[in-house]
């Protein structure tokens, strides 16, 4: 399953939002990958997410596979749409 998300918080995905994303992702057993501009990283890796350099306005594709993939995508989408509780 894949969900396209728009990074809309003011500073993009820096250390704190990356940690929040990984904390949510790690609650699920499914595999989660995040893709930006053709570069794909493990969605359960803070360093991987930060290496995407996803600033405000970046479009991400979040891929999840496994038995709880749909719930993982719903919760990750909610987190991103809430702007990582930064605003």
Task: Label every model-predicted segment.
Residues 1-3:
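Absolute protein N-terminus
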